[in-house]
Amino acid sequence: MSIRHCVAVDLGASSGRVMLASYQSGPRALTLREIHRFTNSLQKVDGFDCWDVDSLEGEIRRGLEKVCEQGILIDSIGIDTWGVDYVLLDKQGQRVGLPISYRDDRTQGLLRHAEEQLGRAEIYRRSGIQFLPFNTLYQLRALVEQQPELVSQAAHALLIPDYFSFRLTGNLNWEYTNATTTQLVNINSDSWDETLLNWTGAPLAWFGTPTHPGNVIGHWICPQGNRIPVVAVASHDTASAVIASPLADRHAAYLSSGTWSLMGFESLTPYTCDAALQANITNEGGAEGRYRVLKNIMGLWLLQRVLKEQHVSDLQGLIARTAALPACRFMIDCNDDRFINPASMSAEIQAACRDAGQPVPESDAELARCIFDSLALLYARVLNELAALRGQPFSQLHIVGGGCQNALLNQLCADACGIAVVAGPIEASTLGNIGIQLMTLDELANVDEFRQVVRDNAALTAFTPNPDSEIARFVAQFQPQQTKELCA
C-alpha cells in the first residue's frame, strides 16, 4: 500500500504552520500532523506596517527541515497564504524593501480616486472583483506615489506565496487564484489587465502570466540532497479552503471562517451584472476553472483583537459566558471600515454602539456577544444577497476553517440564516493545499474526488436552525438595514 507524504505551508495573518499530510491510496485515508507552528505579526518600518518575510522564510525552512529530520521522504510541498500583498524583487532576485501589509493605511482615498478616474462599473467589468480599499490595485498606486525609489529598483512583483515558492526553488510563478485577489486580472482573459495596471503606474513587466494551480514551480533541495517538487497549489488560502469544503451539490454555500469570513458559492461562470456590482460581490478564481462567487466579511478579526486587549486566554470559557447572555442587545456593522485596524477594537465597538444609540457592551462576554450576533446577522444578509444573485435558495451552508470550532457562532449562523449548517473541516486551507498536491501527484483525479476524501476523513458537525431563537426573530428587523461596504 503506497503512502504519499505532502507538506502544506499555511500562512495566516497571525500565525503560520508547516503541516504533514499522509495519504494512503488504498483506503483513501488522509491524516494531518502539525510539524511546526510560529507566530506572524506586523512590524512598523519607516512608518509602514510590514511583514517580516525573512523571519517567516526561516520558520518555513525550519519546518521543512523538521520533517526531513524524521526520516520522511516528502513527495511535494505547497504554500498558501492571505491575498493581495506582494514582494518586490530586483533583477538579481533580491528583495526590494519590505512587503507592506494590507492593513496599513497607505491606500486611504485611492479607491475613490480609481472610481473617479476609471469608473466603478468599468473596474468591475474588467476584474469582477469586490471593491476593498487594500486590493493590490490600490497598493501599487500607493507604492508608485509614496515610494518611487523602490519602483526604479524593482524588476518583479510576486504575491506572498509565490515569493516563498521562489525562495525555495529560485523560479518565478504567478498563481492564478491568488492573482485574482489583486483586482488586476481581467476576468475574461485570465491575464493582467493593462488598463488597470496602467492606472497604478506599475510596469506590466513586473508580472508573468498567471498559471492555474497544479503546476510544479521547481524543486527544493532538502538537507539530505533530495529534490522535492514545490507545487503551485491554490495559493490564496480561501481558494484552498473552498477546495476542501465538502459541498454536497451546487445548492450548497460555503463560509470560510477565520480572521476573515468569506461566504459564497461555486460557479462555472462569473457574476458581473449590475446586481453583483451593487452588492459588491467578488468573482475570485478557483480550481478547475471554477469561480468563487463570494463576499468578504470582516470575520473573527474583531474577536481576535478583543481577546488580546481583554487578556482572555480561555476562549471556550468566554464562549460559555457569552452564550448565557441575551441575544441582539448590542449590534454593529462588522463590515464598517472603522474595524479594519483601530487602535483599540474594544473601544471602537463600544463607540459604534454608542453612536447608534444602543446599550454599550462593557465586559469581555458582552463584547463577544456583540461580535457573534452581528456576524451571524451579517451572514444572513449576505447569504440572501447571494441567493438572490443566483436566483435560487441554498439548501445547506458549510462552515470551514478555524472559526467552525465556535459552536455558538455556528448555531447563531444556522438560526439567523434559517439553513442547515455543517461545520468542518477545521483545517480547510491546509487540506485544500494538500488536495491540489495529491492531484498533481496523480493520486486523485479532481476536486470532487478529493471532497469525497474529506467527507470520509474529516470530523463534521451538523447544526439545525431553530426558528424560535432570539436571533431568528431579530433577522426580519435586521435584513432591510443597509450595511456599509469596506470601500465606503
Curated annotation (Swiss-Prot):
Its EC number is 2.7.1.5. Signal peptide: none annotated. InterPro entries: ATPase_NBD (IPR043129), FGGY_C (IPR018485), FGGY_N (IPR018484), Rhamnulokinase (IPR013449). Pathway: Carbohydrate degradation; L-rhamnose degradation; glycerone phosphate from L-rhamnose: step 2/3. Keywords: ATP-binding, Disulfide bond, Kinase, Magnesium, Nucleotide-binding, Rhamnose metabolism, Transferase. It holds the Pfam family FGGY_C. One of its GO terms (molecular function) is rhamnulokinase activity. The active site is at residue 237. Disulfide bonds join 68-222, 353-370, 413-417. ATP binds at residues 13-17, 259, 304, 402. GO terms for cellular component: cytosol. One of its GO terms (biological process) is rhamnose catabolic process. It catalyses: L-rhamnulose + ATP = L-rhamnulose 1-phosphate + ADP + H(+). Substrate binds at residues 83, 236-238, 296. Involved in the catabolism of L-rhamnose (6-deoxy-L-mannose). Catalyzes the transfer of the gamma-phosphate group from ATP to the 1-hydroxyl group of L-rhamnulose to yield L-rhamnulose 1-phosphate. Belongs to the rhamnulokinase family. PANTHER family: L-RHAMNULOKINASE (PTHR10196:SF93), SUGAR KINASE (PTHR10196). This is Rhamnulokinase. The lineage of its organism: Bacteria, Pseudomonadati, Pseudomonadota, Gammaproteobacteria, Enterobacterales. The gene is rhaB.
